[in-house]
């Protein structure tokens, strides 16, 4: 999965997919009443990027729905996964459950079209704080009470705080999650970060009793760091330059071993080669 980083304006969906992304990451900010409000990152952000592009969250979802609904004039067949980077730092821990419920209702109405031929992309809820695990249970409760528990088949999870892998496993246990787990690791492109924790995550993914299904690394903009991440065995790379990742995947060393994921590749299944 080539994951376009910080895609917060509707126009950027086309831009990143046209550069080679089959997945995008979108920032979601919340208001003081736990409602998802804007797709917005803010300053500071990655080096070389404009930090302030934004849409109202529900409007972005409508644009995203068009981009992922077969038959729509804006449809991109290869856009198959969306990571919502949930900026829950503005919320108290006890607001997490309500934020999850409101997020689910927004998605149900504006992205999934109330279960009637909505967008088809798989969705990852990426949460920065382990203490906010109730966002997951709230999200699930809302979809169930709205009569659409089947949509949880399209939803996966990530805790993005670079926490100890054992602590992450514990948070999932509390949230009742047993699958659909992506594990992120990384840092802003302005700084360097080694691959030690990525290797630990990959080892967990490949062990018989691990909780992780997929591992992705962020934010990778250079060819050499792309090669290093692929050599470590990641499933996804988040980038500001999808074309760079696509170029490296075309190199003879990687062409035989990796390919770009399509809609038929289940993002919740651990890849066994």
From Swiss-Prot:
The cysteines joined by S-S bonds are 45-51, 47-190
SUPFAM superfamilies hit by this protein = PLC-like phosphodiesterases
Record keyword Magnesium present: yes
Lineage: superkingdom: Eukaryota
EC number(s) given by UniProt: 4.6.1.-
**Entry keyword annotation includes Disulfide bond:** yes
Tissues expressed in = Expressed by the venom gland.
Pfam families assigned to the protein according to its UniProt record, in alphabetical order: GDPD_2
Q: What glycosylation sites does the entry record?
A: 250
The record's GO CC annotations read:
extracellular region
Task: Give the co-factor note.
Answer: Binds 1 Mg(2+) ion per subunit.
Quick one: signal sequence residues? none
Task: Give the enzyme class.
Answer: lyase
- Which GO BP terms apply? killing of cells of another organism; lipid catabolic process
Q: Briefly, what is this protein's role?
A: Dermonecrotic toxins cleave the phosphodiester linkage between the phosphate and headgroup of certain phospholipids (sphingolipid and lysolipid substrates), forming an alcohol (often choline) and a cyclic phosphate. This toxin acts on sphingomyelin (SM). It may also act on ceramide phosphoethanolamine (CPE), lysophosphatidylcholine (LPC) and lysophosphatidylethanolamine (LPE), but not on lysophosphatidylserine (LPS), and lysophosphatidylglycerol (LPG). It acts by transphosphatidylation, releasing exclusively cyclic phosphate products as second products.
The family classification in the record reads: Belongs to the arthropod phospholipase D family. Class II subfamily.
Q: What is this protein called?
A: Dermonecrotic toxin LarSicTox-alphaIB1b
């Amino acid at each position: 999965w080539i994951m376009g980083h910080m895609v917060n304006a509707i126009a950027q969906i086309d831009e990143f997919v046209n550069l080679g992304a089959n997945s995008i990451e979108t920032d979601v900010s919340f208001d003081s009443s736990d409602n998802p409000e804007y797709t917005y990152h803010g300053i500071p952000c990655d080096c070389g990027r404009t930090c302030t592009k934004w849409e109202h969250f529900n409007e972005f979802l409508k644009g995203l729905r068009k981009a992922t609904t077969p038959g729509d004039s804006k449809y991109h067949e290869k856009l198959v996964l969306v990571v919502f980077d949930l900026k829950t730092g503005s919320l108290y821990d006890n607001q997490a459950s309500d934020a999850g419920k409101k997020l689910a209702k927004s998605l149900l109405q504006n992205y999934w079209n109330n279960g009637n031929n909505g967008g088809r992309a798989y969705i990852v809820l990426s949460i920065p704080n382990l203490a906010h695990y109730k966002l997951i249970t709230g999200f699930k409760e809302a979809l169930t009470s709205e009569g659409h528990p089947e949509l949880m088949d399209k939803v996966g999870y990530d805790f993005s705080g670079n926490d100890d892998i054992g602590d992450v496993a514990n948070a999932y246990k509390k949230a009742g999650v047993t699958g659909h787990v992506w594990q992120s690791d990384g840092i802003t492109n302005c700084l360097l970060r080694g691959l030690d924790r990525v290797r630990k995550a990959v080892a967990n993914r490949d062990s018989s009793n691990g909780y992780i299904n997929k591992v992705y690394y962020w934010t990778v903009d250079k060819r050499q760091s792309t090669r290093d991440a692929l050599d470590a065995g990641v499933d996804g790379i988040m980038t500001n330059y999808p074309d760079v990742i696509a170029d490296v995947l075309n190199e003879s060393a990687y062409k035989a071993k990796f390919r770009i994921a399509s809609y038929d590749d289940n993002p919740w299944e651990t890849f066994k080669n």
